[in-house]
């Protein structure tokens, strides 16, 4: 049986990357909340 996680950096960045986050209102909310918590990594 095939596993559910098949790693791919392109797909990872397109779905969870910074530009993907900034492209929607809710994604910008995620970035701002992570900035307010002073996260060292904002997104992938």
From Swiss-Prot:
Keywords: Ribonucleoprotein, Ribosomal protein. Disulfide bonds: none annotated. GO terms for cellular component: ribonucleoprotein complex; ribosome. It comes from the Bacteria. Transmembrane segments: none annotated. One of its GO terms (molecular function) is structural constituent of ribosome. InterPro entries: Ribosomal_bL34 (IPR000271), Ribosomal_bL34_CS (IPR020939). Pfam families: Ribosomal_L34 (PF00468). The keyword ATP-binding does not apply. The keyword Ribonucleoprotein applies. One of its GO terms (biological process) is translation. PROSITE patterns: RIBOSOMAL_L34. HAMAP family: Ribosomal_bL34. NCBIfam families: rpmH_bact. Belongs to the bacterial ribosomal protein bL34 family. This is Large ribosomal subunit protein bL34. It comes from Buchnera aphidicola subsp. Cinara cedri (strain Cc). The lineage of its organism: Bacteria, Pseudomonadati, Pseudomonadota, Gammaproteobacteria, Enterobacterales. The gene is rpmH.
């Amino acid at each position: 049986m095939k596993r559910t996680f098949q790693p791919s950096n392109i797909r990872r960045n397109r779905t969870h990357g910074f530009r993907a986050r900034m492209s929607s209102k809710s994604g910008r909310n995620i970035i701002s909340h992570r900035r307010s918590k002073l996260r060292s990594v904002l997104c992938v």
